[in-house]
């Protein structure tokens, strides 16, 4: 029995050590799995030597441990889930930060591209604006030059037209009396009545001709030309009937006075000059009129005009003052004309030396052999005309000088004075005297040159020539007007074409720039849309992946929870099955124990010794099971009653062979250890005590509730059963 007690104590001690050291969860779980398989000793009696050992803890503590372990597992799982969620949140935060950095980089790159494109577009726009400004300035310069050119010919055409008054006409007409030579005026004073009558009739015929009604009113300059043409010349007087009354000296009228503006050119060298040609052998007067064709007139523009040095006529101081404001006009005075026979010849106030010095320029060989010579007249050029398109509207007139050749059959009553003899022109009166007859002057000399012819003696011829001149001038003017209009129209068309081209080019450039801007804007929009679409797709893909991962994690968590729940259910089912098996075994043991106690009751009372004394004293014994199922601290109540109870239990658990053993000196063998120890593992065969115990009323082991609610029978029933058993034993 001592060995049995030691074995029982060893088993209980192992159980107590197991429950008293909950160091690790794995060990506890292993304990929970191995605890149901451990045998529970229900020996009711032990010796007093083992009374100090701790009893097994109640099964309620195991349920609490399981609940605590389950709670710890739940907390651990919650911690793991929280850690996983934290990791997920950190990953999402990192992904979001990476996405934001990526977006910032893309935005910065797009902004840089936009700024670069704007700078390039601004540079292109600036260049285009500069080109447009340059084109505009060039176009304005062309238009300005064209307008200046178109206005200047119009002004010159108006200035040179036959019907418009000439500039400085007042000075011309104020000096009209001086434009004739003295001899012509003297000739007009001393003309014969027959000639006057003839001239008057010719003048009347000219002025009253039917062609005059068709013509416009003559300008003052034209009137002066007509009056000079109607003035009789020396050749006409020589051929007239009154030639005998005239002296042998020839006289000439003043040449045709042409304003210098008839010779115009851009270069002073190209300006035409009046020239006088000597006669070839006849004393007749010839006048070369303006050509009808424009080509011949242009060719004639470059022919220089030559004036003989003897044809210069000095002006009086009054005339110099009057003509000084118009230095550009050249008035070609006529050569001095000898007086008629009836007129006294004024004496020259010049000494012969001065006269010879003045006339030294003209070569003179003999009085009868006279040859004229030419001399160019230099005048101040006018302001250069920027457009030489407008030509002179006044036809050029070439005046031939008429000289008296040697041997001309003129019969003068007195011999003619030598042609080379200088004749001093009288100087005019004081400036206040308007008389046309000049007074002699010592500073004025006239070279002896042949006289010039001023026109024809026939009034019809003069009228015809004048009409022809006017017709040619009108045709020339109309032609020039047409050419000017055509040129202006051409210039205008060119300007319009240039403006149209500039406008088209500007519109084309603007359209191209607008199209380029639209394309760039469209490309930017497409790029932005594409980027947004890519970002959206990436975000959706990440969202789908995140949701998928979350679903997978949730599925794994559910699977793990389901697996844990199934394992827990299996474990609970196994424990329940083991508990039921233990309950059945306990019931069988209790049943066998009750049968053994009832069978051995009488034999125990007949024995002499301590047991009989204890029975007779009637002391109550404390049941063993309540002591074994004491409070959770595992301590058992140590008392003599407990020792006696253990002795009685050991006695009851003895085999039937004990009855056959002899009782020496009336004492039972109590200190001998039984060889047979009750050990009922799962599936073991019942011993002989189990076979003999057939009473099912007494349970072998107290009923414990494995559930928290305690659905099975309570522990007090076991206590009641133990008390009844003890009473029956007593």
Swiss-Prot record:
Crosslink (Glycyl lysine isopeptide (Lys-Gly) (interchain with G-Cter in SUMO2)) position: 273, 295, 374, 378, 398
Chief location: cytoplasm
One GO MF term: signaling receptor binding
GO cellular component labels: basolateral plasma membrane; microtubule; perinuclear region of cytoplasm; plasma membrane
Residues recorded as bearing Phosphoserine in the entry: 161, 183, 200, 202, 209, 219, 235, 254, 282, 336, 366
Region (Disordered), start-end ranges: 1-183, 291-388, 403-669
Stretches with biased composition (Basic and acidic residues): 62-151, 294-304, 373-386, 461-610
List of residues that carry N-acetylalanine: 2
Protein name: Ensconsin
Lineage: Eukaryota, Metazoa, Chordata, Craniata, Vertebrata
Protein's gene: Map7
């Amino acid at each position: 029995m001592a060995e049995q007690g030691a074995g029982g104590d060893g088993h209980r001690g192992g159980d107590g050590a197991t429950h008293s050291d909950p160091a690790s969860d794995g060990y506890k779980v292993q304990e929970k799995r191995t605890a149901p398989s451990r045998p529970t000793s229900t020996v009711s009696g032990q010796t007093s030597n083992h009374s100090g050992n701790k009893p097994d803890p109640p099964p309620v503590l195991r349920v609490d441990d399981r609940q605590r372990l389950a709670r710890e597992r739940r907390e651990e799982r919650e911690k793991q889930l929280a850690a996983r969620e934290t990791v997920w949140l950190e990953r999402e935060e990192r992904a979001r930060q990476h996405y934001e950095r990526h977006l910032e980089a893309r935005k910065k790159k797009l902004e840089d591209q936009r700024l670069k494109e704007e700078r390039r577009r601004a540079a292109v726009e600036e260049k285009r604006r500069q080109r447009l400004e340059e084109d505009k300035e060039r176009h304005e310069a062309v238009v300005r030059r064209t307008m200046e050119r178109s206005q200047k010919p119009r002004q010159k055409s108006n200035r040179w037209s036959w019907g418009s008054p000439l500039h400085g006409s007042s000075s011309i007409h104020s000096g009209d009396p001086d434009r004739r030579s003295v001899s012509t005026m003297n000739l007009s004073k001393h003309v014969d009545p027959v000639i006057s009558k003839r001239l008057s009739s010719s003048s009347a015929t000219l002025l009253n001709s039917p062609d005059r009604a068709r013509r416009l009113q003559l300008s003052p300059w034209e009137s002066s030309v007509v009056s000079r043409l109607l003035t009789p010349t020396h050749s006409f007087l020589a051929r007239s009937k009154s030639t005998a009354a005239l002296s042998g000296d020839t006289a000439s009228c003043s040449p045709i006075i042409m304003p210098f503006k008839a010779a115009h050119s851009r270069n002073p060298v190209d300006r035409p000059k009046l020239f006088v040609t000597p006669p070839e052998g006849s004393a007749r007067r010839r006048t070369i009129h303006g050509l009808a064709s424009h080509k011949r007139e242009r060719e004639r523009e470059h022919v220089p005009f030559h004036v003989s040095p003897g044809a210069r006529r000095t002006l009086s101081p009054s005339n110099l003052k009057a003509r000084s404001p118009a230095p550009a006009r050249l008035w070609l005075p006529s050569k001095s004309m000898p007086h008629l026979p009836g007129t006294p010849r004024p004496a020259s106030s010049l000494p012969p030396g001065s006269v010879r010095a003045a006339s030294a320029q003209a070569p003179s060989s003999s009085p009868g052999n006279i040859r004229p010579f030419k001399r160019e007249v230099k005048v101040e050029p006018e302001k250069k005309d920027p457009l030489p398109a407008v030509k002179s509207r006044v036809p050029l007139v070439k005046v031939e000088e008429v000289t008296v050749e040697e041997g001309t059959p003129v019969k003068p009553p007195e011999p003619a004075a030598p042609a080379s003899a200088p004749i001093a022109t009288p100087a005019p009166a004081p400036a206040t005297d308007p008389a046309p007859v000049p007074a002699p002057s010592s500073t004025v000399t006239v070279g002896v040159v042949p006289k010039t012819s001023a026109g024809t003696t026939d009034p019809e011829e003069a009228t015809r020539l004048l009409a022809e001149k006017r017709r040619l001038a009108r045709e020339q003017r109309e032609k020039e007007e047409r050419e000017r209009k055509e040129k202006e129209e051409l210039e205008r068309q060119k300007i319009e074409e240039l403006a149209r081209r500039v406008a088209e080019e500007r519109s084309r450039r603007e359209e191209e720039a607008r199209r380029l801007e639209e394309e760039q804007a469209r490309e930017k929009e497409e790029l932005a849309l594409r980027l947004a679409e890519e970002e959206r797709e990436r975000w959706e893909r990440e969202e789908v992946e995140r949701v998928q991962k979350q679903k997978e994690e949730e599925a794994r968590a559910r699977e793990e929870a389901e697996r844990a729940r199934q394992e827990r259910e299996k474990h609970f089912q196994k424990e329940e099955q083991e508990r039921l098996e233990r309950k059945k075994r306990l019931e069988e043991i209790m049943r066998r124990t009750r049968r053994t106690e009832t069978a051995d009751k009488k034999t125990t009372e007949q024995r002499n010794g301590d047991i009989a004394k204890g029975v007779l004293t009637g002391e109550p014994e404390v049941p063993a099971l309540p002591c074994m199922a004491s409070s959770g601290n595992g301590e058992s109540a140590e008392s003599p009653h407990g020792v006696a109870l253990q002795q009685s239990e050991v006695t009851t658990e003895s085999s039937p062979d004990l009855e056959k053993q002899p009782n020496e000196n009336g004492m039972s063998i109590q200190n001998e250890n039984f060889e047979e120890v009750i050990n009922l593992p799962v599936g073991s065969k019942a011993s002989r005590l189990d076979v003999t115990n057939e009473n099912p009323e007494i349970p072998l082991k107290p009923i414990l509730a494995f559930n928290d609610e305690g659905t099975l029978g309570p522990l007090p029933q076991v206590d009641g059963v133990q008390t009844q058993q003890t009473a029956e034993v007593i």
